[in-house]
Amino acid sequence: MRNVSRILPLLPGIAMLSGCNNAAQKSNGQNDQKPNIIYIFADDLGIGDLSCYGATKVSTPNIDRLAGQGVQFTNAYATSATSTPSRFGLLTGMYPWRQKNTGIAPGNSELIIDTACVTMADMLKDAGYATGAVGKWHLGLGPKGGTDFNKQITPNAQSIGFDYEFIIPATVDRVPCVFVENGRVVGLDPNDPITVNYEHKVGDWPTGEENPELVTLKPSQGHNNTIINGIPRIGWMTGGKSALWKDEDIADIITHKAKK
């Protein structure tokens, strides 16, 4: 088993290319740099999905290289088997099942982490790191009562220790299908405001349930609400056309932002 050199990958399993990407900073005016720390938190990732753990039907050379240069674990546990609570546990160090409102969050949920809570990002900032969250967020945004995507959104990731955020508010299969950068929806036209609802349909955009002939991906397991880019999502939305992402570009955009 090797010692960690520059990067420590953490791969518990739940859906994103995101986490905390902390640029090394010089401390106290000295020339020595702190090691970079990158958390990669992925949904639906099993031990058999990585070639460094024996997968034969897929090749994961970049992850394999990280494993080869760092520490590779063969026994690990997650605080939850689902998205929102596992992220909550990672950032706060608390068991999500002992906290309220830590179930799978809708895309218009309020921020579920108390801004008074000391998070992993706070601790890294105190240690002299610049911190960033890039990719899937799924911990809610905004105050109690839900998120208004048409103005500066606060509290957000920057309210709990991150210097920078470029995030998907919930998941790629949930509305709103937009990116949020430092509390603002990227590319939003103020004359075309976003409305999001998880209880009933809003607006007149077609849905997978009502218009199955318009979908390129067959709806299933609740993924039959508003259609975005031919894909029926969970939840309903209308507005914000100029801000909608293109699904085929998500990985490239997220990777570009993470590198920055």
Where are these regions (language model features)?
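Formylglycine-dependent sulfatase
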Residues: 2-5, 12-15, 20-260
